[in-house]
Amino acid sequence: MAKKKAISWIKLQVPAAQAAPGAKIGQALGPHGVSGPQFVKEFNERTAKMDPGIVVPVIITVYSDKSFSFIVKTPPASILIKKTIGIESGSKKSNTDKVGTISKEKLMEIVKIKMPDLNAKSESAAFKIISGSARSMGVEVEK
């Protein structure tokens, strides 16, 4: 059997276990001939164990026969940080206005979640990446 040829890749950010075949997904998949409802069904099944509604990136590979496969990534660090400290959004002026504080322990929990998607070789390097994301949002990291 011949290997399928990938013709395009689509990147989306979709709420876990709550995807609906609406405009956002339809507009992204429609031009490639992919069935929106079929993707939504498979995506919701695969993300059922995640926190419902948390936004997760997904990379969809569309093949020449109009079939598809997809990879679900971990939620963005900013969303995990906001959820952990209970804020709606980061600071507009992160260098002067602080919106909250996060402990090193909580940040390490986020690092462990994000580790598969980061290009860091060690947890200490990943910690620096995630703490930088927190600081750029105006969240202070406890020393």
Swiss-Prot record:
The keyword RNA-binding applies. GO terms for molecular function: large ribosomal subunit rRNA binding; structural constituent of ribosome. One or more lysine residues are methylated. One of its GO terms (cellular component) is cytosolic large ribosomal subunit. GO terms for biological process: translation. SUPFAM superfamilies: Ribosomal L11/L12e N-terminal domain (SSF54747), Ribosomal protein L11, C-terminal domain (SSF46906). Disulfide bonds: none annotated. Transmembrane segments: none annotated. The keyword Metal-binding does not apply. It holds the Pfam family Ribosomal_L11_N. PANTHER family: 60S RIBOSOMAL PROTEIN L12 (PTHR11661), LARGE RIBOSOMAL SUBUNIT PROTEIN UL11M (PTHR11661:SF1). Forms part of the ribosomal stalk which helps the ribosome interact with GTP-bound translation factors. Part of the ribosomal stalk of the 50S ribosomal subunit. Interacts with L10 and the large rRNA to form the base of the stalk. L10 forms an elongated spine to which L12 dimers bind in a sequential fashion forming a multimeric L10(L12)X complex. Belongs to the universal ribosomal protein uL11 family. This is Large ribosomal subunit protein uL11. The gene is rplK.
